Amino acid sequence: MIKERRTELVEGFRHSVPYINTHRGKTFVIMLGGEAIEHDNFSSIVNDIGLLHSLGIRLVVVYGARPQIDANLAAHHHEPIYHKNTRVTDAKTLELVKQAAGLLQLDITARLSMSLNNTPLQGAHINVVSGNFTIAQPLGVDDGVDYCHSGRIRRIDEDAINRQLDNGAIVLIGPVAVSVTGESFNLTSEEIATQLAVKLKAEKMIGFCSSQGVTNSKGDVISELFPNEAQARVEELEAQGDYNSGTVRFLRGAVKACRSGVRRCHLISYQEDGTLLQELFSREGIGTQIVMESAEQIRRATINDIGGILELIRPLEQQGILVRRSREQLEMEIDKFTIIQRDNMTIACAALYPFVEEKIGEMACVAVHPDYRSSSRGEILLERIAAQARQMGLSKLFVLTTRSIHWFQERGFTPVDIELLPESKKKMYNYQRRSKVLIADLG
C-alpha cells in the first residue's frame, strides 16, 4: 500500500512538472463567487491559491458576494429589487452591499495571508493588495427603471495591477468600485473578472460552480467547449429560467473573454477538494475548458512524432495486441499515420495503407492511450482515416484485429473471409495471430 502511494506520488509529480514550468510567470484571473466563499471547502481553495502563488503564477482574485448580500438584505428586512435579472442597487442596498463586500475582503485577505501555514512553505509571506484598480460608471436607466448604484466597468488601471503583480502580490478585487465622481457602484464579479482577464492579457480565467463543470444529458462532464457551444449552453439554461447560477454567470464571461484573446477559461467545482490543482496540473483536467483553439489536435504525423508513436504503441505490441513495428519501419511509413496530440503528447494514432487497384484501404496500428479510452478518440480517428480513404478514391476500408471485433462491428464493419483481402495483403496474412478481418463500405 505504501509503495503504491509512493508510485502514485512520483507519477503525479512527473506529470505536473511540465505544467509548473508552463504556468510560471503567467497571469491567471480567478473568479470566486459568494457561493464558493461560504462553502466548507473554501479553506482548501484558498490554500491551493496560495500554492499557485508560491509556484510563481501571477494571480488576480475577483470575489463576488451575491448570497452574502441577499442574506444581509433579508436580515435588514430590505426587499431585493431586480430588473431584467440585474440587481437594482438603491441607497439602502448599496450600504448593505458595501458592508458584505468589506467583510469578505477582510476575510479573504486574512485567509490568503495564512494560506501557507501548516505547509512546508510556512513562514513565506503572501502580500495581498486591494485598491481602486477598477473605475465604475452607472448602468443608468432602462425601460424607465433606474438601476441607481448598479454599475459597470468604465476603466481598469492595468498598469497599477501589473506593478503589484511584478512585486509578487496577489491582487484582490471585490464587487464595489468607485466612479470618477467619487460615487460607489455595485458591479457583477463576472464582468470584473472578464474585463480584467482581457485587459491584463491573462493566460487563464478560472471560475467555480457547484458541479464539476458543464455536463451533458448523461451527467458526464464536457471537458472542452468552444465559445459558440458555451453561448448555446447559456441560452439553453436561461430558457430554463437559470439566469444567475455560477455556471451561467461564468460561461457568459468566458465566451467574451475567449473571443477577446484569453486562451482558456476553466470552470470547476468548489465543492470538491483539490479541483483547482487537478485542473491546472494534469493533462486531462477535471472540469470544463472554454477555448478558442482545442487543447487537442488531430493531424498527419511527421518524422518528429516517431518517438511519441513508439511510446504509445509499445505496451500494446508487448501484449500482442499490435504487430511489432521497428523504428526504421515507422520512419518509412510515417506519412501513413494520423495522430491525436494533447499538450504535445501523442494520445492516439492510426495508419491508412491504401490498395489503390482494389479501391480498398487498411486501417492499422490503431492505438489510444489508456487514460483516454473511455472517450471518443477512436471514433475521431476512424472518421479521419475514412475521410482520407475517400479522398484517395477508395470505396472500402478493412481492419485486422484480435481484440476489437465488437468495437468495429458497432461502427459498421462486417466480419468477412480472408479471401476478400487484397492479394498482396493475403500473402502477408499471419495465420498464427488468426486476426479477424472486418470490412466497411465507405459510401
Curated annotation (Swiss-Prot):
InterPro entries: AceGlu_kinase-like_sf, Acyl_CoA_acyltransferase, Asp/Glu/Uridylate_kinase, GNAT_dom, NAGS_kin, NH2A_AcTrfase. Its EC number is 2.3.1.1. Residues 296-436 form the N-acetyltransferase domain. It is found in: Cytoplasm. One of its GO terms (molecular function) is L-glutamate N-acetyltransferase activity. The keyword RNA-binding does not apply. Keywords: Acyltransferase, Amino-acid biosynthesis, Arginine biosynthesis, Cytoplasm, Transferase. One of its GO terms (biological process) is L-arginine biosynthetic process. It catalyses: L-glutamate + acetyl-CoA = N-acetyl-L-glutamate + CoA + H(+). Pathway: Amino-acid biosynthesis; L-arginine biosynthesis; N(2)-acetyl-L-ornithine from L-glutamate: step 1/4. It is an enzyme of class 2 (transferase). GO terms for cellular component: cytoplasm. It holds the Pfam family Acetyltransf_1. Homohexamer. Belongs to the acetyltransferase family. ArgA subfamily. PANTHER family: AMINO-ACID ACETYLTRANSFERASE (PTHR30602), AMINO-ACID ACETYLTRANSFERASE NAGS1, CHLOROPLASTIC-RELATED (PTHR30602:SF12). This is Amino-acid acetyltransferase.
